[in-house]
UniProtKB/Swiss-Prot annotation:
This is Pentatricopeptide repeat-containing protein At3g62540, mitochondrial. InterPro entries: Pentatricopeptide_rpt, PROP1-like_PPR_dom, TPR-like_helical_dom_sf. It is found in: Mitochondrion. Keywords: Mitochondrion, Repeat, Transit peptide. NCBIfam families: PPR. It comes from the Eukaryota. Gene3D superfamilies: Tetratricopeptide repeat domain. Signal peptide: none annotated. GO terms for cellular component: mitochondrion. PPR repeats lie at residues 194-228, 230-262, 263-293, 297-331, 332-366, 367-401, 402-436, 437-471, 472-506, 507-541. It comes from Arabidopsis thaliana. Residues 1-99 form a transit peptide. Belongs to the PPR family. P subfamily. The keyword Mitochondrion applies.
């Protein structure tokens, strides 16, 4: 029996070092010595060699490419059957066939580690049935605009902080019902919110950018003596993510007001939040203003480095790196990995390879994360042979590959439609004791969606449930979208129903996918109901084809629907959407008037 491609590639480990060295030499666009210089410095009383970067060289544009994408191989029929055998499970529809007892050792995966997936788990002793009962009341009565609070009063709940946190977690994408429940609980006799429940509500307000309410809640916590460092961190990250630099810095003043110490960890948190929001320049300005008031540590320089790398400013990144060394700090593996990612993000692939080579020869030795960064980039560029060489080199170095590395390879081979190789990788993951995680499952679901194979995505989902891996909101959104794209509207709605049944709160993307699918199906009235639900919950107005959506009601001569939507949008602060709906209402009224005159 012929060996699978993955096994064939894995057996070539004896020649890995030679091939890797050859690849490094052949791909050089200029000498590594010119790019990275070493000089002897005394660090911490020891004479050691430090890697320094020539910032001027980063300004050059390197046109040569180190990648040689291979021709895609058509998907063999046997590969589909192989995956089907391993993933054959019941779909969302109750009328589907029974679960198959195929190979349990096969699972699926993905390599998208920049994406937020997953639902945070809350450790608690609360009865899940009680949480479900409360959430059902909130969901149903809020949607009907009924007196939710009165019904909650009648339930005679034994309120606990665990219960409040779990209910808020379920409504973390729907700030209005979450906040109403939070306020109702605050008024119950014998119950008082704690720092934990306040911070849960703060997180929801921060995520939905309800900054005025968020600050009011923060100040209320201050008057009750319930503020924690987590509270300030939530607020700082929220303002930074919204690119509100001045307001983010203003949190320092609130910390002073409530007698909280502003130390290096707090400043690092703010600098990191600004950097992640691609405000590297603003983070640098803030650091320059504050650097005389505190002692920067390794993390301080690393978050500044990351901020510049995220905006692809390698000249400033090199300056921070060298400044770190000048202040007696030796860049650790985290800093090296940040620089590796920065070089790859800035399309300096050959330079990243050189830095990786220097790390191997002079330290710090690459860790699993270092190899994952390199392998992920090779996979994105379809350079799978090189990705395998790096994987083999990692194993030869004594490092144990984790699920993230396998996920990158699975995504790379899956994109090339080499599902037989994907199968072997999944099998090896199980054999090596690194079972697929949630991101791994999401990766293969994404591959199936991209290849317009939603049924396979459903099988993967069922395998995920079978292996007790909790699906994320992203999991459902991908499968639902793939069905709507395939015009299988019944299954698209079935995915939505499954998500609600699982107790997962739909986010903005979930509603957008569903509303677009319903409009495409010609069910604009049903889409209108979900749009109203979004507005009532205080969620963002979805990016949909409003003209197509409105045209159905316009033809039917129903201006009152637009007027109702305009009113709801305006009440929710969605003024742009309100204006669109109001304009369509006027157009529809004029059309109705013309018809009446003609009759």
């Amino acid at each position: 029996m012929a060996a699978a491609p993955w096994l064939y590639l894995s057996r070539r480990r004896s020649s890995t070092q030679t091939s890797l060295r050859r690849f490094l030499i052949c791909s050089s666009s200029f000498d590594a010595d010119e790019f990275i210089s070493s000089q002897s410095r005394v660090i911490g009383g020891r004479g050691e060699e430090e890697v320094r970067f020539s910032g001027a060289l980063f300004s050059r544009m390197i046109h040569s490419s180190t990648y040689h994408p291979y021709r895609q191989i058509p998907l063999p029929h046997s590969s589909v059957q192989l995956l089907d055998a391993s993933l054959g499970c019941r779909g969302f529809s109750s009328g589907s066939s029974n679960v198959s007892d195929g190979c349990d050792e096969e699972v699926e995966s993905e390599c998208d580690n920049d994406e937020e997936t997953g639902v945070s788990c809350v450790e608690s002793s609360t009865n899940p049935e009680e949480v479900e009962r409360v959430c059902k009341v909130i969901d149903e009565l809020f949607a009907l605009d009924r007196n939710m609070e009165a019904v909650l009063d009648e339930m005679k709940l034994d309120l606990s902080h665990d219960l409040i946190v779990e209910v808020l977690e379920r409504f973390r994408h729907a700030r209005k019902p979450a906040f109403r429940f939070f306020c109702w609980a605050a008024e119950r006799q014998g119950f008082a919110h704690a720092s934990r429940t306040y911070n849960s509500m703060m997180s929801i307000l921060a995520k939905t950018r309800q900054f005025e309410t968020m600050v009011s809640v923060l100040e209320e916590m201050g008057t009750k003596g319930l503020l924690t460092m987590e509270t300030f961190t939530i607020a700082m990250k929220a303002f930074a993510a919204a690119k509100e630099r001045k307001k983010a810095v203003g949190i320092f003043e609130l910390m002073k007001k409530y007698k909280f110490k502003i130390g290096v960890e707090t400043i690092n948190c703010l600098l990191d939040s600004l950097g992640r929001a691609k405000l590297g320049k603003e983070a640098q300005v803030l650091f320059d203003k504050l650097k005389e008031r505190f002692t920067p540590n390794m993390m301080t320089y690393t978050v500044l480095l990351n901020g510049w790398c995220r905006v692809r400013n390698l000249i400033e990144a090199a300056r921070i790196w060298n400044d770190m060394i000048d202040h007696g700090l030796k860049p650790d593996i985290v800093a090296h990995n940040v620089m590796l990612e920065g070089l790859l993000r800035s399309m300096k692939k050959s330079d990243a390879i050189k830095l990786f080579h220097v790390m191997k020869s002079k330290g710090p030795c690459p860790n699993v994360r270092s190899y994952t960064i390199m392998i992920r980039d090779f996979c994105k560029q379809s350079s799978m042979e090189t990705a395998i060489e790096y994987f083999d080199d990692m194993v030869d170095s004594g490092l144990q590959p984790d699920a993230a590395v396998y996920t990158c390879l699975i995504t790379g081979f899956g994109t090339q439609k080499k599902l037989d190789t994907v199968y072997e990788l999944l099998k090896e993951m199980q054999e090596k004791g690194h079972p697929p995680d949630g991101k791994t499952y999401n990766a293969l679901i994404k591959l199936m969606a991209n290849q317009k194979m939603p049924e396979h995505g459903t099988r993967i989902y069922n395998k995920m449930i079978q292996n007790e891996i909790e699906p994320s909101i992203h999991t459902f959104n991908m499968i639902m979208k793939s069905y709507f794209v395939a015009r299988n509207y019944e299954m698209g709605r079935a995915v939505w129903d499954e998500m609600i049944k699982k107790g997962i709160c739909p986010d903005d993307n979930s509603y957008t996918v569903l509303i677009r699918g319903l409009i495409s199906e010609g069910k604009s009235r049903e889409a209108c109901r979900y749009l109203e639900e979004m507005l009532d919950k205080g969620m963002k107005t979805p990016l949909i084809d409003y003209n197509k959506f409105a045209a159905d009601f316009h033809r039917g001569g129903q201006p009152e629907i637009f007027e109702e939507l305009a009113q709801r949008a305006k009440f929710s602060g969605k003024f742009a959407a309100a204006e669109i709906f109001a304009r369509w209402a006027q157009m529809t009224r004029r059309r109705c008037k013309q018809r009446f005159m003609e009759d």
